[in-house]
Design a protein with these regions (language model features):
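Alpha-helical scaffold segments that form or flank carboxylate-/histidine-based iron centers
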Residues: 4-12, 33-51, 89-95, 119-131
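A structural signal for long alpha-helical coiled-coils and helix-turn connectors
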Residues: 24-31, 54, 61, 81, ...
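Conserved alpha-helical segments that form or flank metal/cofactor-binding pockets of metalloenzymes
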Residues: 37-70, 139-145
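Alpha-helical bundle segments that constitute or directly flank the non-heme di-iron/ferroxidase center
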Residues: 1-30, 91-115
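Carboxylate-rich helix-loop segments that flank metal/cofactor sites and access channels
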Residues: 51, 55-104
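Generic structural signal for well-ordered, non-membrane alpha-helices
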Residues: 14-21, 25, 44, 48-51, ...
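Preference for long, well-ordered alpha-helical segments
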Residues: 96-146
């Protein structure tokens, strides 16, 4: 696996991890069972995606780096700070929409910056972007209901 592909795979893995961290922190604050279930499904989808990244890394004989402790702490602190201001379901959904859009943009930029990659990695990137876009659509629908 080329350096640009390792960078891309690592970034996908780390972005999925950030999504899981964010969901883990907000899910405890959600009282609406339908919205909670939606976030649980998103968490599980991120987890399965991380597993796919792990499999590709093992098959390519590379080790993926997790997010640094500082980045995890920063993400957790940002979520808690935002929740401290407003714990409403509407605010949580708005916050997750913002994070999801940031993830979509990051995926597109990183993919473009990495240039030509293997077909297997291209499929993984496309699947991750599609997954995030699906999350975005579901979050928009929930926002319209609250």
């Amino acid at each position: 696996m080329e350096d640009n592909e390792i960078k891309l795979l690592t970034r996908l893995f780390q972005d999925a991890e950030i999504g899981m961290i964010s969901i883990d922190k907000v899910i405890k604050k959600i009282e609406d069972s339908a919205i909670r279930k939606m976030f649980i499904k998103q968490y599980e989808a991120y987890d399965k995606f991380k597993e796919r990244c792990d499999v590709l890394a093992v098959n390519s004989e590379i080790e993926l780096k997790e997010n640094s402790a500082m980045k995890k702490f920063k993400q957790t602190a940002m979520v808690y700070l935002s929740l401290w201001k407003d714990k409403s379901c509407r605010h949580i959904i708005e916050m997750m929409i913002t994070g999801t859009v940031m993830g979509i943009v990051d995926t597109i930029k990183t993919r473009t910056d990495c240039g030509v990659v293997s077909p297997e990695l291209s499929v993984l990137v496309a699947d991750f972007q599609k997954m995030q876009e699906d999350f975005y659509e579901k979050l928009k629908k929930q926002l319209a209901k609250v």
